[in-house]
Structure formats: structure tokens, C-alpha cells
């Protein structure tokens, strides 16, 4: 979507302008179409303007998206208007779009505000003496589960600043990094690079649709071509005052709760021949993924300074079971088949290989997302582990009955990098 504005014309055209304005008013009355006119000369041009947001946020709801939208957005238009532009062709570029950039800025603002009630854990950047959690029963005894949660002791400054007190708490393995070779001394991750914040599991976190609207004198151009690839000319164009509702879901690898394509699966990239560019796949059918963290934790408050309390895990009740996500193998394989069909239209006579990430930050290597205020990091090796030959046959490295469910192991991250002071 792009914003278009009307441009002022200061030339002395008032005589012809008055006549033209009268003609436009007659046409408008006949067809119920309106256009902003300055001195009788309607001129459209591409414009960069500040959009504003609209939402149906509930002021009484303490969920962080509702709290942010209540203060930052206006109520939605109960009767939105869309005008189809006949015989109009416009060029669009989804990869260089001012609307998207403003959305990103708003998401950053939303997350900053959402993390403000959370405790800054930077004062906890001390040496942690950690051991594997003992006296715990593991559900299946896998090595992935063992060592996932560690029991750590550390010294913290109490409310009285010159007093030191020894405390202990349970930390996820993703939240700590070793500082010696014997794997007993640790520190919180990202302590030496930026401000870190404790995630807030108690905070309600459920994205709501956000609409972006153009101010008076501007309109948003919308491309309605169902197979539009993201760049180039679009022949089915309309104008709207606001976009559709967009849920600001933040995730990596898999896009959650996105919009579905009407018709076939659509793949988009800024440049398919450049392997450094991202390829976005828009599915035509949703694939359900159910995620859970089955552990039952008890928490305790640890004073880490005046007015600051860190809520840490004290113990785990019952079995230690790994967080995981479930997805239907049949639906996933059918989705991959449709994606491969579209990829082969771009890469002819090529073998398509779905493989896991070769390395990098946890957010890149794993499927990361926020669920109920907790940050999940899930291994997608089982999802991206197949080879599709150029003659339309495929070879799954782990063939099995398609009626089964793929169980994706996940890890929880409690300490997050807030990135700014």
C-alpha cells in the first residue's frame, strides 16, 4: 500500500478552476465520488506522510496491546469506504514501503512500553554458581531435558545497599552462559553488551488488529491483484483511508496469524536470484500449530535493589516435561508440496532442499515467538528436513505415516535483550 496526496497549485487559474470545480461537483453528485481539489486542479502524487493507527482496543483490558493502542490509536471507522479506480495501473514495491516502516516503529514502541513493568535484570549480572537440577523427575529422561533447567546460587545487593545476601533460583539454559571451563560458573546472557530485562509471564500478551490510516488530504492505494508478487505494476487498484487490521505478531522462521492468499500459494522476494534475500511464502490454507509449556513452577521474589524484585523460579512441581509444539505431518507435507511447486516456477530444473539453519543467533536458528508472555525457541529440524527432486518427486529423510503428529521441541527464554537504556 502507498499513500497518495493532492498537491497545491498556486498558478493563476481561478477562472478555469471555478468552471472545472463546478463540473467536478456535478460529477460527484451523480456518482457519489469525491476528490480533494486545490484551486480546481486535482493533482495526485506519491507522498510520504505520517500515518496514524486505529483499533478497537478496550480501555479496561490490561493486555499490553490494548494498553498501548488505547493511548496511541483512535477508534476504527465503523463504515470504511473503498473506491475502485477503473483503468488505473500503479507500481507497488512491498520491500520499500513507508507504511511498513511506520508499522515497525510502532511495534518497537509497543514492546518498549510492554517491557517497562518488567524488572531490569542488569543488577543481576553477577557470577552464578550453577548445577544440574537434582531431585527432579524427567518425563522421558532425554538428554535434551536434562540440564535444560539449572539450579544457581548467587550474591545480590539487598534493599540496604551495603548488605550482600546469598540467593538461589532456577534458570533456563538459554538464559545463562559459562564463564569458565568447568561449567559451574555462569552469568546471564547479554550481560556485557546491553540492558537485559526479565520477561513477564504474568503479563497478558495477545496481539489485536491494528489499522493504519492516512490523514486528511491523503489516500492509501491498495493493490487487489490476488497473484501480485510484491513489486511492479498492479492493474486492480483501489483507494482506502485505512488498511485492514494487522496483528503485530513478532516471530522468526514461521509467520504466525498472518493473512492467507486467495487462490494459490504465493511466494515473494525482492530478488529470487540473490540467495541473501528473504523469500516470503503466503499460504492459502492455515496450518495449525499448538504449543505448550507443561511445567508447573512455584516462584519467589528476590530483592535486587531498592524497589526492584526479581521473580525467579524456586522449584518445579511434578515431572519436568519439555515445552513443545505439535503440527500435523500430513498438512505440513502438503504445504511443502505447494511451496515447492511455486519455487520450481522460479528455479527450473533445480532440486529444492529444505534444511535447518547453519548457525547464528537463537532467533535465527530456531522458531522464536512469544506466547502468553513467555518466549519460546523451537527447533524446526523436523519441519525443514526434506529434499524435492526436479522431476517433482520428493525424499523425506524421516519417512513415516502422514497421520502422525510432528512434535517440535522448544526451550523457554526468561531473560531478554531490551537493547536500549
Curated annotation (Swiss-Prot):
Disulfide bonds join 53-73, 118-200, 125-191, 130-152, 213-242, 223-234, 291-325, 378-410. Residues 1-31 form the signal peptide. Pfam families: GP120. Glycans are attached at residues 87, 97, 129, 135, 140, 151, 155, 183, 192, 229, 236, 257, 271, 284, 290, 296, 326, 333, 349, 355, 385, 391, 395, 403. One of its GO terms (biological process) is fusion of virus membrane with host endosome membrane. Residues 152-191 are annotated as: V2. InterPro entries: Gp120_core_sf, HIV1_Gp120. It is found in: Virion membrane. Residues 378-410 are annotated as: V4. Keywords: AIDS, Clathrin-mediated endocytosis of virus by host, Disulfide bond, Fusion of virus membrane with host endosomal membrane, Fusion of virus membrane with host membrane, Glycoprotein, Host-virus interaction, Membrane, Signal, Viral attachment to host cell, Viral penetration into host cytoplasm, Virion, Virus endocytosis by host, Virus entry into host cell. Residues 130-151 are annotated as: V1. GO terms for cellular component: membrane; viral envelope; virion membrane. Residues 357-367 are annotated as: CD4-binding loop. Residues 291-324 are annotated as: V3. It comes from the Viruses. HIV-1 lineages are divided in three main groups, M (for Major), O (for Outlier), and N (for New, or Non-M, Non-O). The vast majority of strains found worldwide belong to the group M. Group O seems to be endemic to and largely confined to Cameroon and neighboring countries in West Central Africa, where these viruses represent a small minority of HIV-1 strains. The group N is represented by a limited number of isolates from Cameroonian persons. The group M is further subdivided in 9 clades or subtypes (A to D, F to H, J and K). This is Truncated surface protein. It comes from Human immunodeficiency virus type 1 group M subtype B (isolate NY5). The gene is env.
